[in-house]
Amino acid sequence: MRKIIFVFAFILLLSGCSNAPEATPQEAAKAFNGDFTAEARTVFGDSEAEITIAKNSMSISIFVTYPAELEGMGIEIFDEHAKISYDGMEQEIKTDSLPEGTPFLLLEKLFDELSDPEDFTLSTENGNLLAKGEDFSAVLSAEDFSLISAKFPAYETEFAFSEFLFSGGK
């Protein structure tokens, strides 16, 4: 009888039973409703770029740091318009005039959907969280919800995030 109890306890131990609460979309959305900064590498089609990102309650700012010929190009996205800057020039445009699969707009869509718990599901995978929306899947840190990566298969676009920092924490 002792062996059976020991084997059962050992199986429970190996199966990872814990009392840790599961992360919810509401908790993740709360984090993404705040301000944050990040660095990311994006691959879209046959191209790639490195960017810096800053999100606040008013806008999302994205600046290209690589490739060298686009370094310094930036876009600040507001609700329905954007301000594009490059080499001392600025132009305001409506966001709906940008091509649908533009990495800038995909990031805006990602952050917008991760800010609304009704727009994505959340599950655990390999010690991280997997958020799935209509057009994307994203891997989040289980510790603080920071983005690790995101994929938009329909647009052949991927983002790998580094230095992702929420201003107010989790």
Give names to the regions the model predicted.
Residues 27-32, 37-42, 84-136:
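Flexible, processing/modification-adjacent segments and terminal tails
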